[in-house]
UniProtKB/Swiss-Prot annotation:
Keywords: Transcription, Transcription antitermination, Transcription regulation, Transcription termination. Residues 18-49 form the KOW domain. One of its GO terms (biological process) is transcription antitermination. SUPFAM superfamilies: Translation proteins SH3-like domain. PROSITE patterns: NUSG (PS01014). It comes from Liberibacter asiaticus (Citrus greening disease). Participates in transcription elongation, termination and antitermination. This is Transcription termination/antitermination protein NusG. Gene3D superfamilies: 2.30.30.30.
Length: 70
């Protein structure tokens, strides 16, 4: 049931915006900085471009794997 699924899905209090600079805090790309290219609020995921070995690499991460850079 979609209503039950929506109730069980944790809601993040952190909101990301396209173009925002973030730091990856968890996973294989931890400590890399990147730029948010897309936000999927339904799945609580962000698409971030990070520079790895001099190349821009798109990665998809959960909200809890990135932190805003202030």
């Amino acid at each position: 049931n979609q209503v039950e699924a929506a109730v069980q899905r944790p809601v993040s209090s952190v909101f990301f915006e396209v173009g925002e600079r973030v730091c990856v805090s968890d996973g294989p790309f931890a400590s890399f900085n990147g730029i948010v290219k897309n936000v999927d609020e339904e799945k609580s995921r962000v698409h971030v471009e990070v520079v790895i070995f001099g190349r821009v690499t798109p990665v998809e991460l959960a909200y809890n794997q990135v932190e805003k850079i202030v």
